[in-house]
Design a protein with these regions (language model features):
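Short pre-catalytic strand/loop immediately N-terminal to key active-site residues, enriched for Gly-Thr
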Residues: 21, 87, 152-153
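Basic, ligand-binding patches in group-transfer machinery
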Residues: 139
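Short, glycine-/Ser/Thr-/acidic-enriched flexible segments
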Residues: 2-5, 50, 144-146, 168-170
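Acidic/histidine-enriched ion/cofactor-binding microenvironments in catalytic or ligand-binding pockets
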Residues: 37-39, 133, 145-175
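N-terminal accessory/capping or targeting/presequence segment of soluble
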Residues: 1-34, 95, 99
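Short, solvent-exposed amphipathic alpha-helical segments in soluble enzyme
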Residues: 13-17, 37, 59-62, 154-156
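Short glycine-/acidic-enriched loop or helix-start segments at secondary-structure transitions
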Residues: 8-9, 54-56, 174-175
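Flexible, acidic/His-enriched mid-domain "rim/lid" segments that flank
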Residues: 26-133, 144
Length: 176
């Protein structure tokens, strides 16, 4: 399905070759193959992400000879550690965001609206190599600066305004 295709495409873009199995018998076969190849007697399940019904199916039908161990945050913990290639990709995304802001910063003096400035910043990130923005860019000026997650509005940025920016670039699958 589309989730498997998206995962495949994103992994391929990051230079990773992997079989993607989202659900069903193909998932069971993929996991069983990995458990067998590793000669694993235990299999960790992310307790916050696996339903009770799925856990029972795994325990009684799919892997009756394997001890299932509930885990919490195991995968997230592994993702916290970055290799040199990942650090380089994150640094590249940060550089794109920095260069983009440097390019459009002077436009603040022209009095654009928050929305206009946000659009210019997003476009500048793309011009400098971003595949996308990391999230919806926040531009909040004057009294809007006190609003968490303010959406850029038609308010004009004027001299003396405090301007709060929250933005990021997505480059090669990594966010700044």
């Amino acid at each position: 399905g589309r989730y498997g295709q998206q995962a495949h495409d994103q992994l391929a873009a990051a230079g990773v070759s992997a079989a993607i199995e989202v659900s069903g018998d193909a998932q069971r076969q993929a996991v069983a193959g990995a458990v067998t190849a590793a000669r694993a007697g235990r299999l960790g399940l992310e307790a916050d992400a696996v339903t009770w019904a799925a856990q029972r199916t795994y325990d009684t039908t799919w892997f009756p000879d394997v001890e299932l161990v509930p885990t919490t945050g195991l995968v997230a913990g592994l993702r916290q550690v970055k290799d040199d290639g990942e650090v380089a990709r994150i640094a590249a995304a940060c550089a794109v965001a920095d260069v983009a802001l440097a390019e459009v910063r002077s436009r603040l003096a022209d009095g654009p609206t928050e929305a206009e400035f946000g659009q210019e910043l997003d476009l500048a990130m793309r011009r400098h190599g971003a595949d996308d923005v990391s999230f919806e860019t926040i531009v909040a000026s004057g009294p809007n600066g006190a609003k968490p997650h303010h959406r850029p509005s038609g308010r004009r940025i004027t001299e003396g305004d405090l301007v709060v920016l929250d933005f990021g670039a997505l480059v090669d699958g990594y966010h700044s």
